[in-house]
């Protein structure tokens, strides 16, 4: 049995696709809310958690899909589950005009709640950093 898909939706307080897109698709934007440092070189995003003088966790993700102002899909390089990836996409509410950030990720059944909590924390940092 493989990892299970998790779908999460976060309503945002903006109507600007470009503002949200910058936060979810660029190394600079991701660095504001996902990790301490993020770099992008030839479609490989490297995420570093921790500071230089402490223990660090470094993971890399390969860019699989990129559709501007729509979605970005990445796959952790060390993930052996062929079907697993993580994706962030933006949609607009027909009712309010505000945007929603959709997260798709994959986790083992016993780790789904922990992964959801991790994304909740990431989105709290996004809100604090950008007001979204």
Identify the residue ranges that each predicted region occupies.
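A short, structured loop/turn motif at beta-sheet edges
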Residues: 17, 64-69, 90-99
């Amino acid at each position: 049995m493989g990892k299970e898909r998790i779908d999460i939706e976060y309503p945002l307080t903006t109507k600007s696709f470009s503002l949200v897109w910058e936060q979810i698709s660029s190394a600079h934007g991701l660095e504001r809310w996902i990790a301490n440092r993020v770099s992008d070189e030839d479609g490989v995003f490297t995420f570093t958690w921790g500071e230089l003088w402490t223990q660090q966790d470094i993971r890399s993700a390969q860019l699989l899909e990129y559709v501007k102002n729509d979605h970005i899909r990445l796959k952790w390089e060390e993930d052996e589950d062929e079907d697993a990836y993580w994706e962030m996409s933006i949609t607009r509410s027909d009712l309010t005009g505000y945007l929603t950030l959709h997260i798709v990720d994959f986790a083992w059944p016993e780790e789904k709640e922990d992964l959801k909590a991790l994304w909740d924390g990431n989105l709290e940092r996004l809100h604090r950093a950008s007001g979204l």
